Amino acid sequence: GANHAILGITLTFSGKARQGIVHIENAVRLNPEPPYWYYFGIGMANYFLSDYDSAIENFEKVKEQNSTVVWPYWFLASVYGQLGQLENAKWELSELEILGETLTIEAGNNSTDIMDPTYSALYLDGLRKAGVPEK
């Protein structure tokens, strides 16, 4: 299961979200209790494929399983920024602050492994629309 998930996330980060999501979903099917990061991979792939509702659903699953991991908050802020749902984006950013984290574009760019320039631009654009400061 984990090998499928890792392959899927790697494919997603490298610009092949449509292929990646198939592997991650296979990993979920093979594991009766999939770890939170499987859902994070599915959420990212959905986001990069512009399936924002599914992305939100999967990022929320990550938060349900592990509320202290920062990535789903980052990506939810970006999704909500793309959707123009600024109140929801601000909520995610305030949740990050409760965790003792603040997000900047610079930090968001430096701490993800998104290798595909189109996907990276979408993610950072969403953060900017959400009102995340550059530094």
List the predicted regions and their residue ranges.
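Alpha-helical protein-protein interaction modules
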Residues: 1-135
